[in-house]
A protein has these predicted regions:
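Catalytic-core helical/loop segments in enzymes performing group transfer/polymerization on anionic/lipid-linked
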Residues: 2-184
């Protein structure tokens, strides 16, 4: 377990800390901050069916430590396949990872493969804008899942990111060490 996991599992947060956290979240949302702030915020019109569920899958780089240690057998392609199989009528958005777009990291970028499982690929858009389009975010370990939680979206995890297992997310895998129920 990590230091963060131990803090979350074993600490009681008083009203003052919770109030400070709430103010910080408000600032994050007000300024549309996320881990990657290099992409512009855009309003995109999706061509979906009426009442069609919209799912965002934020891509991840396969050699990232969170994927290696927390991916639990999932890679981006397996995630795409699993989400499509379990949500056949959904409109699925694939958000290419910023480090893959910039060419700095390796990741799934073959659109012919990606578009077998999703309806649209977004690249040059902020994660905040992408999250605003969806009803749910499905991820392995991406911090975009945490961004989505802050924005009151349903989040489904398939690996074990730091924010999974606390009652905030719908988890494909369970972490028996995480027994405390947290809130934002």
């Amino acid at each position: 377990s990590s230091d963060l996991e131990n803090i979350l599992q074993n600490s009681d947060f008083d009203a003052k800390i919770k109030d400070e956290a709430k103010k910080l979240v408000e600032k994050i949302l007000e300024n549309k901050f996320s881990k990657y702030n290099s992409f512009s915020h855009k309003n995109i019109k999706l061509h979906t069916k009426e009442n069609q569920k919209i799912i965002l899958i934020p891509a991840q780089v396969e050699d990232d430590a969170s994927m290696i240690y927390g991916g639990l057998g999932f890679d981006t392609l397996k995630l795409l396949q699993t989400v499509r199989q379990n949500n056949q009528d959904a409109f699925i958005i694939y958000k290419t990872h910023p480090d893959v777009v910039s060419g700095n990291r390796k990741g799934l970028k073959d659109k012919n493969i990606i578009l077998k499982y999703c309806d649209i690929v977004l690249e040059d858009i902020s994660i905040d804008s992408a999250i605003s389009l969806c009803d749910e975010v499905h991820t392995i370990t991406s911090t975009a899942g945490f961004d989505a939680l802050l924005r009151n979206k349903k989040v489904f995890t398939y690996g074990m990111p730091f924010y999974a297992g606390w009652g905030l997310t719908n988890d494909f895998n369970k972490c028996t060490r995480r027994t405390k129920v947290l809130d934002l």
